[in-house]
């Protein structure tokens, strides 16, 4: 079972608090941000000692900047991968989305996907639980 702790990491440009959630189990430590449900760091034992195997940023501002084009460690959605031509048909109706990939496709939920949401976090029985309600 992991030890779970919470610490303020910073604020978004909209003034929302972002928590850094730390899970520690033995020699392993994972750090997850509530911004984007993002895995920021994962420390693991290696020959050279404990090493971080995640490419992460040092501030909420940097995560906000890169989250428009990169998805380092983030939870993506509503859709994972590309929706070609940023549109799809469902039950005979065509839905047009914002093209955020190469100017023609919708990638990983678009410009305001799950990777840009501030998630709720709580500890439950030694586990980290992140939740986010995506409005229709």
Task: Locate the predicted segments by residue.
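Surface-exposed acidic/polar loop and edge beta-strand patches at domain peripheries
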Residues: 1-136
């Amino acid at each position: 079972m992991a030890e779970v702790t919470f610490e303020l990491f910073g604020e978004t440009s909209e003034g929302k608090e972002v928590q850094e959630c730390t899970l520690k189990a033995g020699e392993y430590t994972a750090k997850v941000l509530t911004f984007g449900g993002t895995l920021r760091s994962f420390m693991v034992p290696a020959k050279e000692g404990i090493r971080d195997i995640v490419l992460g940023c040092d501030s909420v501002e940097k995560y906000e900047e890169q989250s428009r084009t990169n998805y380092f460690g983030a939870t993506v959605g509503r859709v994972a991968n590309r929706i070609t031509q940023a549109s799809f048909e469902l039950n005979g109706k065509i839905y047009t989305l914002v093209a955020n990939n190469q100017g023609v496709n919708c990638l990983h939920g678009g410009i305001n996907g799950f990777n840009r949401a501030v998630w709720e976090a709580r500890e439950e029985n030694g586990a980290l639980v992140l939740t986010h309600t995506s409005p229709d």
